[in-house]
Design a protein with these regions (language model features):
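Short, basic/aromatic beta-hairpin or loop at an interaction surface
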Residues: 1-11, 103
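Acidic, glycine-rich flexible loop/linker segments
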Residues: 7-11, 150-198
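Short alpha-helix capping/helix-loop boundary micro-motifs
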Residues: 13-19
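Short secondary-structure boundary/capping segments within folded domains
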Residues: 20-24, 55-58
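Short, well-ordered loop/turn sites that connect or cap secondary structure elements
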Residues: 24-25, 30
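Feature captures the catalytic cores and cofactor-binding loops of soluble hydro-lyases/lyases
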Residues: 38-173
Length: 198
């Protein structure tokens, strides 16, 4: 819902309540606490097209899907160091986003550059989900500071590190900008229209 032109700083749980989501306005600055997971085309194809069961109990464990390929180093003991968690462009996943929201119960999609307002209206609004965008380029290391630990890693052998599902415990993870709200409004489209009209 569009409530104000002034952005606010919001701390949001990665399993947000409907009430918490309803309070968000496009342009708000969001920091996440809780557990987020990465999923992109490899995961989407495996679950939605190949019919393989999800490796994580969603949305109970997390309702926040990050479009990301972590820059990770794996140690001999199996633990990881994440140097950066850099978002990837979400528009590439448009064909899967509706079915994924339905299957996963995700309420937060996090990525780079947003998606179309048509995607927001057709897929996000019916599922009570919003889109959070990263802030510019080169923020992967900044976001990495908010990752407290790698809780789990699923389908590494099948998909490789970039496409595997990373399950990350995060704290003060951000900043992200609310790009879409529960009504399907798009911050980027609103600002582009204002620029075009000026």
């Amino acid at each position: 819902m569009v409530k104000s032109n002034k952005p606010r700083k919001i701390h949001l749980n990665a399993n947000p309540t409907p009430e918490a989501l309803a309070e968000l306005s496009i342009g708000d600055i969001v920091y996440l606490d809780g557990t987020v997971y990465t999923a992109r085309e490899g995961i989407y194809k495996r679950v939605l097209e190949d019919g393989i069961a999800m490796p994580l109990d969603l949305p109970a464990k997390s309702a926040a899907n990050f479009h990301c390929s972590p820059a990770a180093t794996q140690h001999d003991d199996g633990s990881f160091d994440l140097g950066a968690v850099t978002a990837t462009a979400s528009f590439r996943f448009s064909k899967w986003i509706g079915p994924w929201l339905a299957a996963s119960g995700a309420k937060l999609i996090i990525g780079k550059g947003g998606m179309s307002s048509q995607d927001y209206r057709d897929h996000f609004v019916p599922h009570g989900a919003i889109y959070l965008t990263t802030v510019g380029y080169g923020t992967g290391a900044l976001l990495g500071r908010g990752v407290k630990q790698v809780r789990d890693l699923h389908w590494k052998e099948e998909l490789g590190l970039a496409q595997a599902m990373w399950v990350l415990d995060v704290e003060n993870f951000g900043p992200f900008i609310v790009e879409s709200d529960l009504e399907g409004n798009s911050l980027f489209e609103r600002e582009n229209a204002r620029i075009a009209a000026s």
